Every structure is written in C-alpha cells, then in structure tokens.
Amino acid sequence: MKTRIITAIVGILVLIGVMFTFNTMVFNLVIAAITLIAIHEIYSALGFEKKDWLMYAVLVPYTLLGMLSSYSAMRKLVMPMSFVLVTFFAIYLVVRNGTISYQKASGLLVFSGIVIFCFYSFVLLKERLPVEKFGYDAVFFILLILCFAWGGDTCAYFAGRAFGKHKLCPVVSPKKTVEGAIGGVLGTMVFGVVATLIYSIAANRMEAFTRSNIGVSMYVIIALLGCIAAVLGIYGDLFASVVKRQCGIKDYGTIFPGHGGILDRFDSVMFIAPFVTMVITAVFYA
C-alpha cells in the first residue's frame, strides 16, 4: 500500500508538470511517448517474439504522425495512413506464412487503435480548444476525463467495500460488485459537477458554462457525461482484464510500482476519453 501511495503522489506531481507544458509541443511528445509505451505493453502481453519487432515498429511513425500533426492535417492523413498500416499487417502475415497467428496480429492492431484514439483525444482537445481563444478549457476537460476515470474507480472501490454483495462480472473481475458500480456512477457524476463548478468560478467561465450554445447548462451535460463515463470506465477496466486473463499476465507492465503499467492505470480512460472529447467538441465548441 505504501508503494502504491508514493507512486500515486509522484504520478500526480508528474501530471501537474506535464500540464504546465500544455501549450507547447512538449505536451504532444509526452502523449506520444505514453501511447508508444502502452502499445509496447500490448505487444509484449500478446506474446510477440523479438523477430516480430516490425509489428510494433510500424506503429511508431503512425502514432508520432498522429500526435504531432495538426487536426486539419490528420483529417487528410488518417485514411492513407490507415490503409498503409492495415496493408502492411496483411502483407506481413503472408510473408511469415502462417508462423504468426491472425488473431494475435488483429489483437495488436485493434487494441493499439483503441489506445491511439484514447490518447489522441487529449491532443484533439488541445487543437480544437486553443488557449488563446478558450483559455484553459482544454486542460480542464483533460483533467475532468481523468477525474471521471480515477475518481469513479475510487468511489466504486469504497462503495464496493462498504455495500458490495452482488458480483458484477465474477469470471473477469471477481472483486467488482453491482453496488460498487452504482457508487462509481454516482460518485463520478458528483465529481464532474463539483469540478466543473470550481473551474467555471476560478476561470470566470460561469456565464459560458451556464448558457451553452445548445441551450442546456454545461453542468447538466457534465452530470450526464459522468454517468455514461462511469459505465465506459468499468467496461474499459473489464476489457483490459479480459485481455490480461487470456494472455496469462497479472499486469501489463511495471512502470508504475504497485500499480502496473500504462494500461493498468489508463484502462478505465480508454473509452471515456474519446467519448467525452467527441461530445464536448461537437456540442459545445462546434
């Protein structure tokens, strides 16, 4: 427990440091590095051999290009980049002549795609909500996404310990309970509304958040987002657990002592980040 607490404190300090670089290319580079580490964890979990390093290496330029390019450039590049990537995987399977399984290659491609979309969401928020025009709204929403994920996990943990009686998904995650999940949903909604209220007051955004361009208060939308995000966070956690069980591993990595790897810490963020980003950018900042 002591190791977990120390790691969490260090992680929070690092997160604060990274957010100070938000308006620079350093932020994009950090996100790209985190993404590549996560993809490498997938590569290792699926049991690829060293001679299959190309399977991972080909994802490096794809990831870097995505994280370091502007949104307008990405819109033009995503189709040709995806075509080249999928074609490479198909050719590689043929060249290896059946010595590498289609299931493993597909798993790497799909799981990596989920991870890339997850972390690209942070870059997209930066691009679509520039500091010069919207202040630090993008920083707030990135932190809100993490708050949805990790705050929901915390609420679910304590609610489960206090009231948990009915197993949620015993085969995949024996410790998760229905009561814990409900506590996580309610806690996430409260976390979201309180965090939004604090930010809107501190950043003098009360009027903008109260009277959104769709006629619905941002606080109402955040509460609804929190509810859906909590469910997506639980699903992301279960999805990552299923993969770990099928791969026969306990953790995806050891980069966070006491917590595991990047994917062990960001599993609940995987589906929350793209969802919240799409809603926020499409509804409030269209």
Regions found by a protein language model. Give the residues of each.
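Interfacial loop-to-transmembrane junctions
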Residues: 245-268
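Transmembrane alpha-helix interface/packing and boundary motifs in multi-pass membrane proteins
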Residues: 228-233, 256
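Membrane-embedded alpha-helical bundles of polytopic integral membrane proteins
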Residues: 1-227
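Juxtamembrane boundary at the C-terminal end of a transmembrane helix
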Residues: 198, 202, 278-286
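Final/C-terminal transmembrane alpha-helix of multipass membrane proteins
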Residues: 265-282
